[in-house]
Amino acid sequence: MQKLHTANKAADSLGADEILETLLVEAGTARELPTNEHKLLSFLGLEQLSFDFMHELSFLDTPAKPEGELRAALHMAERVIATQSGMAEQRKRFSMFHEIAHCVLPEHQSKLFVDTDQTLSMWTRIRLEREANKFAADLLFQGKLFTEQALGLETSLTTALTLAPKFGASYEATLRRYAETHVLPCAVIVYDKVGRNEESYVEDDEYRVQYTVSSVPFRKLYFSGGVSMDSDSCKARDIYSPHEVWSVGRVMENELVIASQGKEKWRFETEVFSNGYKVFQFLKRPVKRSARS
């Protein structure tokens, strides 16, 4: 990586946070929203191309196709970031930021990085890929800038939905960032659709909890030992208010009772939203504390 002029140390001796801050400043996109990926590419001397990896694997110059669906690649010698053609814009931007992370983080010394759905996932176990994902998210949300703006608004699911397009991020990525970085106790439960009976009503659609994200204060106050649900799956009507008509894109309110692994139960005020693929339930505050069971 080239010298970061505003840094007091060589680029390879900087921490990730220092690299992030100086990269945004020197590329001229600090506090510019959404983060301008073209300025980052230009500053780093990188070119972005779109490929159909199924038919153009020769670009990768790799002896074997990696496991999983290819989404992005960084070719250091050619100074090229390649992304899968046809990807949604938000996913494409995150993939580009992931490859930029490989380019600038000191220990990421490979001449070729090839990334799939697995390595771009928040669940990857590969250390370098976890680091690249974190740096990509920090580029997307400009470090602490997102949190600073979020804290100036109401603690609500609606706040995250409002900020998402401003930062050029998906609703899911924004809700994750919102919950995990908030200074107040809050959490989001993400439900994935299990299946749908075409002969039944939408409220009979079945969902499972895919994952949960919570702020540090939330974990300290309520569920330091983890959250447990009563069952592995539930109906849509159990997530939304059963007394109101709901639709994709509409935020609704409901209450939810959940228990810690120690079986301590809490009833929370929640807000519920669906992007058409998943359902997000934002836990705001406890309504009342029930007796231990």
Give residue spans per PLM region:
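Active-site hotspot residues in diverse enzymes, especially metal/ion-binding acidic/histidine motifs
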Residues: 1-293
